[in-house]
Amino acid sequence: MVASIEDAAEYGERADALVSGLLGRVMRQRRTVAAALDYIRALSRETRANCWELAAAAGHKGPYRMQALLGRRRWSWEKARDALPGLAQDVLPDDPGDLIGPGLAFDETAHLKKGKSTACASPQHAGVTGKVENCVTWVFAALVTTLGQAWADFDVYMPDCWAKDAARRAKAGIPEDLAFATKPELAIAQAKRLVKAGLRVLWAAADEVYGRSGEFRAALRALSLAYVVIIPCDYRVTLAEGRTVRADEAIAGAVFERRSCGNGTKGPRYGGWALIATADPRESLLIRRLDRAENKYTFYLCWAPEDRPATMTYFITIAGRRWPVETTFRTGKDALAWDQSQARTYDAICRHTALTALAQLRTAAIQGALAGAGVLPAAPAASQDTQGTPDETTVNPDDLAIYTGTAPLPAVGGQPCPPGIRPIGLSAAETSRIERLARDWKAGILTTVRLAFQLRWSAWRRRHQARARWHHYSTRLAAPAT
């Protein structure tokens, strides 16, 4: 199948209409819906997720609408999160011919931070670097089907040091009634929310952070979700004959079969697999031996309800569907700049994540439509407040001017900032950016209107930096010498 660029544009408009309809049920004001849709579409471009760059990508004259969207505008990110399962099921429909059907993959990922002011940021293990980092950790539940994967639910993990510090919580806007919860407890809450919301899922997969939790596995059983969860090698398992052993001690009596758990980027993911019965007739110990690495093993606890086959093939297939949650993290970080947000308060970081989840589903909808695997409803006529084009389309000669002067510094501390302060001088990075714009404009890649828009943004950024520098210098010069 071959799709045209016109198809891509049409599917983008249809996906916008789908997301806009959802936003309209979450947000009361049309301008908030329009700003949120602009935010989501801007995330889909190659840009950093700070309000300045998102606003420029969306065609706004300044960052104020984006800042208000994450801050003072009245809307509930929790309602937006609750709407994710319905949209996810529409975008990633079930394949009737799939052996295991749709399921959930749980995992956590870190959003690295420099300072200590961001809500829930603290030194903790970050899987992205493999060491302790100052970061915010999130727990995600991804809907996984044969058509793709996307975030269906999320929670921010609040470390114990934050949970016990009332003053710090209040400053970051963390609700007083939000209690500390472990990562498995957050995943349990997500599974319950998703099943209650009517999302059709049949299984769950997770790594050892969740697999070692008996409460997590019990919750999945109560929800009739088959599971394949990783456990550590020293986890004790009671075998069918009644003997309790470490998981790695069961290797001695295991008979391995070479099978594939799915296709990867380099072909089928083969490995040696062995299924060992446990004292629970519906639960088994699954062992994977990495291909060409005889001393590397992964251990799983597997369970299936009575109406599903508790076979090796069934469990291996589920085990292979855990990896797509990592794909959602790569999409969120690499394609949608989720981890580059400069939001700090609790509501702001959760709003940004909710909007990123919608951006991920929007992308999945377009991807499925282009591949011929999904159907998007026809989009209504676009309104003026959701076009995402530059606010001004007229070009004056001054709009193409490049301000190269340097803003003045305050001679005396405490002086007010001049109302018409000049921008700061051109940095090397800004010079390179402007030269690239000029080159694209001369080659006909960039229109004059878009060039003028980008130059206005350049002047705005540097004038804003000049005002900030003025206030910093003025404050320091006014401070008494020590």
In which residue ranges do the predicted regions lie?
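A short, flexible helix-boundary coil/loop motif
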Residues: M1-R31, L43, M158, A172-K183, ...
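Conserved, well-structured functional cores that handle cations and Mg-NTP chemistry
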Residues: V2-A204, V209-A226, C233-R236
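Non-catalytic, well-ordered alpha-helical scaffold segments
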Residues: A34-L37, W52, T298, T313-I316, ...
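Extended, non-catalytic structural segments that build the interaction scaffolds
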Residues: D38-A42, K296-R322
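Short, surface-exposed beta-edge/turn micro-motifs
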Residues: I100-G101, W138, R282-E283, K296-F299
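Short amphipathic alpha-helical "interface-anchor" segments enriched in bulky aromatics
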Residues: A110, Y210, P309-Y346
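Catalytic-loop motifs flanking and including active-site residues across diverse enzymes
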Residues: T137, P324, T328, C350-A357
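A glycine-rich, aromatic-flanked flexible loop/lid motif
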Residues: I287-W303, R321-L336
